[in-house]
């Protein structure tokens, strides 16, 4: 939980200080569904202590294979600040018109990047990012 807490608190802090503008602020990419689920669960737990208004502005969604894609598309329409997901599902949703646009992501976290680098080689979805912060965990 230590490294997860560090990068999640950093993301939350930057969003709260309004250093990050726009709807979608952060993408956390994980090499497994289980890891993505764990990080999503921890992020929601960390945000529970905030007021309802802050919690609403800190909307987090989980985009992983095996979950209902139509439900995930509905969640994306609610304009999340943080997306946590796996490369396959992220790629799938970026290929659908007007579903997921990653051009304005300002923080991109690759969790367990040593295991992720091989997977990223297979996906060419992150080529035109304007990133202000990149955290390799």
In which residue ranges do the predicted regions lie?
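Conserved helicase ATPase motor motifs in RecA-like P-loop NTPase domains
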Residues: 1, 27-33, 110-116, 130-137
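Conserved nucleic-acid-binding Ia/Ib motif block in the N-terminal RecA-like helicase ATPase lobe
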Residues: 20-96, 104-107
């Amino acid at each position: 939980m230590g490294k997860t807490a560090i990068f999640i608190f950093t993301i939350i802090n930057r969003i709260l200080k309004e250093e990050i503008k726009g709807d979608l602020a952060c993408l956390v990419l994980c090499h497994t569904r289980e890891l993505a689920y764990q990080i999503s669960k921890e992020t929601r737990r960390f945000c529970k202590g905030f007021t309802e208004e802050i919690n609403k502005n800190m909307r987090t969604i989980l985009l992983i294979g095996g979950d209902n894609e139509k439900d995930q598309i509905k969640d994306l329409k609610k304009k999340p600040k943080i997306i946590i997901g796996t490369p396959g599902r992220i790629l799938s949703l970026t290929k659908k018109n007007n579903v997921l646009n990653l051009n304005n992501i300002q923080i991109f976290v690759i969790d367990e990047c040593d295991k992720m680098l091989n997977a990223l080689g297979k996906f060419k979805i992150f080529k035109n990012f304007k990133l202000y912060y990149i955290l390799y965990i």
